[in-house]
Amino acid sequence: MSTGTVVQVIGAVVDVEFPQHAVPQVYDALKITGEGTCNGLVLEVQQQLGGGVVRTIAMGSSDGLRRGIEVENTGSAIAVPVGKATLGRIMNVLGEPVDEAGPIGEEDRYVIHRAAPSYEEQSNTTELLETGIKVIDLVCPFAKGGKVGLFGGAGVGKTVNMMELINNIAKAHSGLSVFAGVGERTREGNDFYYEMMESGVLDKVAMVYGQMNEPPGNRLRVALTGLTMAEKFRDEGKDVLLFVDNIYRYTLAGTEVSALLGRMPSAVGYQPTLAEEMGVLQERITSTKTGSITSVQAVYVPADDLTDPSPATTFAHLDATVVLSRQIASLGIYPAVDPLDSTSRQLDPLVVGQEHYDVANGVQNVLQRYKELKDIIAILGMDELSDDDKMTVSRARKIERFLSQPFHVAEVFTGSPGKYVPLKDTIRGFKGILEGEFDHVPEQAFYMVGSVDEAVEKANKK
């Protein structure tokens, strides 16, 4: 192993000089071996500047780092623990435990920079993944081994939706999950850990956190650390769920690193390599003939603008998009999923079946018609509408309310127990509303219930 010395430190960017014959490769991990507070700090090589000097990004705080400190080349990229030992543990970007529960005790380590599976290895079968959340199962169904994006501005419920998905899927499908917290709030990471512990699924989840307060290098690489752990489970023949909260912070960390490295920014100040960086991550999240990775990614939408380069680049990689709307959230309807804006490649009669497809289409048509009639109602009132339109409005309002649902993870705040609704019950309920079976039931009865039977029961009680 070659050793070098630190020649320049600018925040998270550290330049290290090595002998000309032993210059580290790009993405190699370097370790600070000199004395002081930074002993053990890991640096990742980003550029070779010539003359034996490499430019690196620090994977931790560079406080106390000074010129002349000795640095050792590890000879490979950052390697993290993988396999069963990671389940139930919280780790940082380097795979070091941060939950004070002793060493990980892993049997194997993988480097975080790996090639995506080749075309021949990839699987092409389609199978639906039931989530138990009515609006998602109906309008934007998830595929096993697919990629799903949860789009939403600040405070419309991305994290709560993601927590509910983890809770439902871990309980109903008893699958393994990897949760990568990329640049999110430490409080949420803490809540998530205790929630998983309380619901008894902690031994099925591996958690990797690179929170908001950490340097950009950590936030940029933590998604790859989580993905590497998920890949190991997939290669063992398991079906894994990879949750990334939040993919926008991954882009943002890339922007910070890019600026620190002195690259010219592109549109809206993003890094010029935005599409390539996103592609490197997304292409690895795929299913092979051995096992599957189903990924759910929360995507923060800056200023609710879906045309911003970051969400727009993410859109291209996804099979299903769940768009959370501030307008729906303001009506008190949670989950605040917009059924007219959310899409899924799986919503095809050949995949979901003709009945499901027709009901989903019917729901969207009724809601779209109601949206068009809203202006007329606002100006002239309900009385000016034809009988058919009055019927459409009445059913649309019932559908809107029936799309809401109490969540298990929100029980603490709402006091109402969470509901898991099987897909067949979801289809039966919406089909009944569309066909006028429940025209006699008041719309309030459909608010915050599980299956349609609960709505009827609620109405009868009144």
Swiss-Prot record:
InterPro entries: AAA+_ATPase (IPR003593), ATP-synt_VA_C (IPR055190), ATP_synth_F1_bsu (IPR005722), ATPase_a/bsu_AS (IPR020003), ATPase_alpha/beta_chains (IPR050053), ATPase_F1/V1/A1_a/bsu_N (IPR004100), ATPase_F1/V1/A1_a/bsu_N_sf (IPR036121), ATPase_F1/V1/A1_a/bsu_nucl-bd (IPR000194)
Molecular function GO labels: ATP binding; ATP hydrolysis activity; proton-transporting ATP synthase activity, rotational mechanism
Covalent S-S links between cysteines: none
Broad class of enzyme this protein falls into: translocase
Cellular component GO terms held in the UniProt record: plasma membrane; proton-transporting ATP synthase complex
Membrane topology: Peripheral membrane protein
Catalytic reactions on record: ATP + H2O + 4 H(+)(in) = ADP + phosphate + 5 H(+)(out)
Location of the protein in the cell: Cell inner membrane
Keyword tags: ATP synthesis, ATP-binding, Cell inner membrane, Cell membrane, CF(1), Hydrogen ion transport, Ion transport, Membrane, Nucleotide-binding, Translocase, Transport
Function: Produces ATP from ADP in the presence of a proton gradient across the membrane. The catalytic sites are hosted primarily by the beta subunits.
Quaternary structure, from the entry: F-type ATPases have 2 components, CF(1) - the catalytic core - and CF(0) - the membrane proton channel. CF(1) has five subunits: alpha(3), beta(3), gamma(1), delta(1), epsilon(1). CF(0) has three main subunits: a(1), b(2) and c(9-12). The alpha and beta chains form an alternating ring which encloses part of the gamma chain. CF(1) is attached to CF(0) by a central stalk formed by the gamma and epsilon chains, while a peripheral stalk is formed by the delta and b chains.
Family from the record: Belongs to the ATPase alpha/beta chains family.
Protein name: ATP synthase subunit beta
Naturally occurring in which organism (per UniProt): Shewanella amazonensis (strain ATCC BAA-1098 / SB2B)
Gene: atpD
